[in-house]
Amino acid sequence: MKEMLLDKLKNCKKLVIMGIGNELKGDDAVGIYVVKKLMRYFGEEKEFINIKNLYLINAGTVPDFFTDILKEIKPTHILIIDCALMDKDVGEVKIIKEDEIINYSFSTHTLPLSIIVKYLKKFINAEIIILGIQPKIIDFCPISEEVKLSGDKLVNTLIEIIEELKLAK
């Protein structure tokens, strides 16, 4: 996964990592879980933080709310992390191509991810990377241990990449 992400993030000058999901719906929270852990590592946990050329956004169920902020930031790359029903093993992380978005069911946000990505492509000249994480359960419960473990591994990989690309220091 690290090599694939590094390849997608080559020439990255300004990175936005956006976590999407609903913390009340089990594994649907994984995007938020990852971003919150990154926030704690790089600074503080809020809805939005900026460290040098790294922007971390906890978008919750309203990623469309942050489109104006993204237009102001003008990132070169946007990494969206979301729970996705992909018929994969629980916790599996997959880079989802833009033309594959319609094949998967994403978490409980207000607008479909396909519409958000089309909007971002139209108004922001950025490479958009979508990471889907296969859930175990999407119900009123805590995030499952399997998906949490997968999220922790992704956090460690992202920290390595961010430090390697010198985006936050």
Swiss-Prot record:
One GO term of the biological process aspect: protein processing
Keywords from the named record: Aspartyl protease, Hydrolase, Protease
Keyword Protease in record: yes
Keyword Hydrolase: yes
GO molecular function term, any single one: aspartic-type endopeptidase activity
EC class: hydrolase
Pfam families, A to Z: HycI
This enzyme's EC code(s): 3.4.23.-
Bridged cysteine pairs (disulfide): none
Family indicated by similarity: Belongs to the peptidase A31 family.
Protein name: Putative hydrogenase maturation protease MJ0631
